[in-house]
Amino acid sequence: MRLPVTVKATKPSFLVIWIRYSSAASSPTVSLNPSGRLQQTLAGSVEVKGKSLHSGKFSTVKLNPEIAGAGRFFEFRSRFIPASIEFAQESPLCTTLLKDELKIRTVEHLLSALEAKGVDNCRIQIESESSDDREVEVPIFDGSAKEWVDAIQGVGINAAQNHDGESVEKMVAHVNKPVYVCKNDTFVAAFPALETRITCGIDFPQVPAIGCQWFSWRPIHESSFAKDIASSRTFCVYEEVERMREAGLIKGGSLDNAIVCSAEHGWMNPPLRFDDEACRHKILDLIGDLSLVSRGGNGGLPVAHIVAYKAGHALHTDLARHLTMD
């Protein structure tokens, strides 16, 4: 069994990524192919409540089983908002879904867990503290996706059936030609590959405790996400906290739901769960954002080698849009 590896580099140009892919790829940039697996859903419902990161308000989320072909979608104020790239809106430090003037903020950790655990069809009921709110935020918990993975594993997963009581094969996007999006020296790219792999790099030269990190991961088996990615927590630089609060962000942020690193003093709330926890969390976010490629209960994360460097939610979702253009 091949385990995930961390590649340390002082400069990103020192990282050489070898990608194997077939030269006989079909002409479309992305094709939807059978996966050999059935669409799945939850075996029952599960409800959780928690504080949100940016608004600081509490919200309640109930995950429910859904029929094959329904896909993943939120229910807020009796309206349905599909967890689809068509409804993604650019917002600072999180991914937001917008439909009919209703907003669901910070969806990435929950969607990452659902995508990685194979919950293809799910009705996500969400309620805010106030019945008058036009927007609501998914709870942050400890800043990772561990709470969501525990909830999913606790209730279990079944094959989903359609209205006729039949199982439906899950289709998955295959990248046939390289696709990339970039801004200045940051980028996200998807290359043709025989299997799904994500390679991520971050670089914080002003924060030595973080520095330059690379991590490469692939879903080897069902427990890979829970073991390698899910428990990695969101992180921030201490010197940027006040600026974020002045911008109306991280009102619910604390040392209990994020790992905080100071340029001068290093990590302020150790121990880390992984030496490269910050880089792993970027992969967690990327999986959640690319889950928005999913439609009709099919896979969101494509069969491709996805390589990201210093990227954030805006670039992640931009790549997702490019992957759904054909």
UniProtKB/Swiss-Prot annotation:
The cofactor(s) it depends on are: Zn(2+)
GO CC annotation terms, alphabetical:
membrane; mitochondrion
Q: Which InterPro entries match?
A: Ribosomal_Su5_D2-typ_SF, UDP-acyl_GlcNac_deAcase, UDP-acyl_GlcNac_deAcase_C, UDP-acyl_N-AcGlcN_deAcase_N
Q: Which reaction does it catalyse?
A: a UDP-3-O-[(3R)-3-hydroxyacyl]-N-acetyl-alpha-D-glucosamine + H2O = a UDP-3-O-[(3R)-3-hydroxyacyl]-alpha-D-glucosamine + acetate
Q: Looking at the record's lineage, which domain of life comes first?
A: Eukaryota
Enzyme class, broadest EC rank:
hydrolase
Q: Name one GO biological process term.
A: lipid X metabolic process
Q: Further remark, if any?
A: Plants silencing LPXC do not have altered morphology compared to wild-type plants when grown under normal growth conditions, but they do not accumulate 2,3-diacylglucosamine-1-phosphate.
| Family statement drawn from the similarity comment of this UniProt entry | Belongs to the LpxC family.
Q: What is this protein called?
A: Probable UDP-3-O-acyl-N-acetylglucosamine deacetylase 1, mitochondrial
In its UniProt entry, the species of origin is given as: Arabidopsis thaliana (Mouse-ear cress)
